[in-house]
Amino acid sequence: MIIEERKSHELNLESIDNDLRLESVRQNAEKLGWDHFARSVRRNLQEKHHTLEASIRLDVLGSLAFMKAHLPIDKDESLNRKIQSLADGLGENCVVAAHIGGISIKSHDVSVDIGIAEEAIVSCKIGYFGQPLFDAPEALALLKSDEFSKLRDSIAEVLSLIPKEISLSDKNACKDALRALEHVLIRDAADSSFSAINNNKYGFYSPRNELRPGRLYYIAEPMLIRVAEKEGKMHADNSHLDSLPYIEIFFVKSNKKSKLPVFNQSGEWTTFNDAKVCICIRFKHAFLFSQHTIRKLAKTVPKSPVVRSYVNFYRYATGRPTVKKNLELLTQFPNETDIQQHYNVDSSKLASDSDSLVVEMFLGDLRELPKLIETLRSEWMHASLWESIVAMCEPNQDAVKKEVRAANLELLLRRNEFNLKFDTEFGNMSMQISEKEPRRYFIRTVSQLTGDTPSSDLDNLLTEKLNSTWSIPISLTFALSTLNCRLNSLLSPLNYVKPSNPFDSDKRQQWWLGANKTHTNITVEKVKKRIVLEIGPVIEPKELVYTRQEDEELCGSLLSSFGEVDQYYVQTSTIGKTGPQPRPKREPSQLASMGMMSAELDMARNRQSMEHAMHPRPQDLRELSNLESARIQMRQSIGAAHAVGLASHQSFTSPGPMRHHPYMGGSYDSPGFYGPNIPASVPFPDAAAFGKGKQRKPRAKKQPGEEVAAPSGRGKGRKGRGAAAVGAGSGRKSSGVVGENQYGMDQMRPQLQRSYSDFQNPMNPQHMPQYAQHMQHMQQMHQMQNMQQYQQMQQYQQNQQYQQNQQYRMHMQQQQLQQQQMQSPQQQSGMNTPKSQRLTDEDSDEDVDPPRLPKPQVSAAVSRPSLPPPHQLGNPMVGYPGMPLQSPNHLPLTPSPLSAPPKPFSPEQHHFGTKMRDNAYWKEAERNIDVKPDIEKLKQQMAASSSCGPVLGTAATSSSSDPSTSGESSNATESASSAPLMKPPTTAQTPKKKLGLEATLSKLRGVQEQALQKQEQQRIQQQDSVDSTNSEQPTPQPQFSQQPGPPLAPNQVNRVMNMSNAFDDEAGSSTNTSDIKPSLASLQKSTGSIVVDPTTPGTSSNIAQPSGVMPSLKKEVEEQPPEREKEKLIVKIPKILKVDDRRDERREKERDRDRDRDRDGDRERDRYEKEDKSQREKDKKERDKERKRRDRDRTEAKKEKDSSGTREKESKKRKREKSEEKDKREPDRKKEKKEGKELSKTTTKSVLPMIPTRTLKNFRIPKKDTVDEDKKEPKDESIPGPSTSSESSTRKEVAPAPISRKESTTSSVAPLQRKESFTSQSGAFPPSEYHREPPKKKPPPISGPAQGSYSGSSNAGPISSSSRGSGNGGSRKPPVLPPPALPMRGPPSDQMYRERTGSMRGFPPSSHYHGSGGSGGSKQVASYAQGLPPGMGPPAAKPHGNSYQASQWVRPPTHRDSHSYHGMPTLGPPQISQREQPPPPPQMIPLPKENPPPPLAPPSRPHRDSRARGGGDNGPDSPEEGTLRIDDE
């Protein structure tokens, strides 16, 4: 059946399906009976896969257990089945065992033995809390009368004395305290007389028996005592005890510890136990407390009491919901001659509802019990005095109106006194009835005229009468006639609203007036116990309260526990309202609201249908069957358990008729005080403060499409905690309210998806579509995961294959190169002569030095889609940018001062880089770092080796197929270069710009350039003739022990420039350091033929040459020329820079210490990440501060850089003019160089180990004839530039010039500029939108690349870094170079580099990559085809022609991934030629979610072979064309 209107047709179908399922459950419940009802409900919930929040799930199970414990036991069942049901109701842990004499029920707290003989119960014994069994006659009577339900409820009530949810130690403490309390009460409160009940310390204690807890009677009404005395009874019997109020003492769980006494035989409480419980005082009826008394008790109680409702203390007894004006009451004395009393009560004390009806009170110490009893007696007496007036003024049922004489009395109500005013013949009088002592009132009459008491004897008489009768009207009858009060005629009874129902015993005391027949009948009637039940512990006490008057016929049934609304209480309650309280409309079920699916439910339109759909409450519950009654109560139990959904999804709505009422707990543990916001130490505020209790914060509802996108890991049915998870299950929504069906079972419950049923049962036909959809979704998710795993595996395999291919190619190239060099050493010697380079201050045109770089890290190029595939598992150094094409074994293992850290990588690269460092690089570095060289021994070895002739190996070609040998060579070379006393070669001198070196060189060139040129040419010729017979081979010989390793690995040179020269303003070119000491073995190998001069350790570097060539080191320094420059004035540089070099040496030492500290931090970073996260945060902050400091330095440098802009333009103009003549001088220059190559090669090999490469930032070549301008430029050049422009521009400015693949294989310094330009930056980068493709513009005349592009190769003579200034102010005409021999495209000219300003200086123009013979072509080559990463090519051609102006600023790209050569040593400068390209290396599949890198343009095999053979001096890949020559300027 459809019980509500929905907008969606699909929702209507589901609603019908839910109703059919619930109806099936009802039918099954009838068929199976109540024994299997809980099982049926549970199975139904599981089959429907409802998902409930954890707390609500517990509520449902608790509700089922509660129903099971309170459902009536069927009397038609067999005896064994009844006993089994009895045991089930006593707890889950009860064990039923049959023995010879009957059946026993045992649990931890109770034992019941039922004797059976001939199918009849003959005996019953019960033992509680581990005590021995005792006979239970009352229990036996119930069993014989077939009242198993009552017996079960009675035993459960006794067991509730000690809570079940506390710990075992606390439970034992409670048992001991209960025993001690009962011992004391039985001893001190055994007197059952009425006087003892009122005056004893504890009153009268009725001990606990087998069916009920102990009861403590604390007060007896005087009128009841008078009735009993008339019967001749001085002690209370059972008939009287049933009418007397009492309290029961329980223990309840608490968060605070209480003092519990320890039992002893003496009964003295000397020792106590601490337990997280508190003493609960449960009243027979709700006790009426005034706000004044509550405030006094709040100081001693550990927690707030359980309040049934907030009322007005005085108005509550009258039965009037509101009193708008003064209340008028007229007594109804029976005799006509009696003077009636007309009370006019002030309404100010009848307005506020600040008093409370308390169900349970709590104590923290049992020693406070006497004080509490005394307070209860005082409060009771005060209420009785007021109720005596109200009761005496109630008219009889058959009363008729008549005229009576009455005295007018003005009554003012207060908690401690009653103040009366009346007129007498002697004037106005006032009577004060005050409580001087607890339960002891005194009356004092005062004349308002005189202020004196008319008669003290009258006051004493009135006091005695009042304390004996507890009735103000009876006491006043003795005063009105004596004081001659003025009387008025009134009609009796007064016309005031009569209550529809008689007063309950907790509202009025009936027995003081025996003349009233109505009240006399009530005195002998048993007072019904009122039970207030909490439905669901998660609901605030005020939100769900159901009460009903207990019915004798339904006693012990389910209805007696759940209860109905008290009709009288609904009409008379004034809680939170000033007007009559009508019966409120019942709110929708909580479970139904949680199961709502439509967020657009129109509440206004459906309100009426929902109200009709709500099950009507039966008028007469006695007519209902047990099944129907249980259905109603089951709805209340289960539905209330889901009320959290309503509180969480919607605004607060009180769900029941008692929504304004706090509730009282029933016979089980109460949830706590009605107002949870009131602490125990704070007195009760007004009821208005409790209009709304603590509520859950609403949580976001699940959207309709969220379920499909739910993570597969949690499962479709898994929900988060909270209301959103409760209500929004399986595609449903929990916004809105639906009506209830007439049977109380909510038609839509949220799915219960347990661990074994995370998804709907596929065997259920109704769930097949959902299950299929879910399986399809899961299958898609698995496919996606498998695809990702496959891609990752394929990527890893390709990375491995790529590494192997690269290593094989490098190995093959080096072998071919070795063979070619062995076969034609002279040709190789002539061809590779100008491979080495020297850099001076003139190598850079910018005034910026790169900032200090952070710790060395390895790029995790895997995460960069635009990068070539990295060497993930190879040597970590392979991943460095600028790595030459060499074997992975040919790598430096000892971090030397020249090994500057590369650029910091992105966070995604961090993990990969640190792992590689820890595994290989730094661990190997630890082996040789602490070994100090033996200088004397080295000198001896060098002297001995000088006679044999030096054999120097090249840098890149020294790597062989033997990994260990290559590694040793590399170590030896690096160790030699990092020796503290080793002096770097003078030819590689790189003084800092700030030292004025450029100006000094300009002066020296202008004076001695011509003389030095001739002198050097002569010396070169001499050396060439002397060493012609034993000229050394460029490739390493098989005798590796007789030759040093490569002078310096490219990455080391790069790092040394980044560290030693790149980010210190005044740092010199000296790379000496005393902190890092290479191993002795490596020094011995590398310095076998090198002369060390220890006399000048801190000065500028000198050239170390074989001793057999020159007699002294000083002479060697003066005589060594670069192979490609015949005129140099570098000889005197060391003397000029000695003072500055010492300062540079100090700075170098500081940098070395910083580098060591950074390296140690890198080595322990992984451990820090695991051990101390806060330490990593701190380190990160320090690095941020360092980066900010560098940014500030670059910002300051930017300001100084701007001042040199004018000089740059003028200087560049002169450069272009000079570069036009370069090609003319090139042929002559080559011819001259061939004559003395061997000697220059020999000198170069000794120089290379210490070649300090310049930063090459913002590279430019100043003019030769601007000596005065050059003096000014070094000042500006030493200042670091801004992080956004100058620093970033280095990426393109310092890009390498074209170099052959053989060069990149054999050169240890050639790829230096790539690392410099791509990895030495640590600041911000400009946007990547400035990446441009090479323009289609014809390039300038072809010549060597800009100086600084290459540091030269290890097997060739050094290229003088200052040869540009060799001419005298530019007056010398340089020699003209011959044209290239092969019809192949040559490298770009330095003219082009000078013209291309900004960030692109350092890259050849687009014409270098197109066409042939240096002519511009129309075809545009992609950046990856140029040997560059994507986006690194020259900018695209503009429509108007040349893309670059002399002063044009080209912004470098933003991201490092387009600048770096991570893991791609072959991606050096562009190697595009007209020959066939070789197949490309295997590409790596990029990670998901990123774009794959563009494929590399595969160079052809013939081209690689040509490069391996050398191809001639004038080939396109020739070092002569691939390296900038400076001397012809």
Swiss-Prot record:
Designated name of the protein: Mediator of RNA polymerase II transcription subunit 1.1
Compositional bias annotation for Low complexity: 722-739, 807-828, 958-990, 1008-1023, 1279-1288, 1349-1365
Family: Belongs to the Mediator complex subunit 1 family.
Biased composition (Basic and acidic residues): 908-919, 1113-1130, 1137-1185, 1192-1240, 1262-1278, 1289-1304
Gene name for this UniProt entry: sop-3
Coiled coil stretches, renumbered: 1008-1032, 1169-1202
Disulphide-bonded residues: none
Biased composition (Polar residues): 1051-1061, 1068-1089, 1096-1105
Assembly and binders: Component of the Mediator complex.
Keyword field: Activator, Coiled coil, Nucleus, Transcription, Transcription regulation
Positions of the UniProt region annotated as Disordered: 685-740, 807-919, 933-1529
Record-linked PANTHER family: CHASCON, ISOFORM D-RELATED (PTHR13585), ZINC FINGER CCCH DOMAIN-CONTAINING PROTEIN 13 (PTHR13585:SF19)
Biased composition (Basic residues): 693-702
Protein's organism: Caenorhabditis briggsae
UniProt superkingdom: Eukaryota
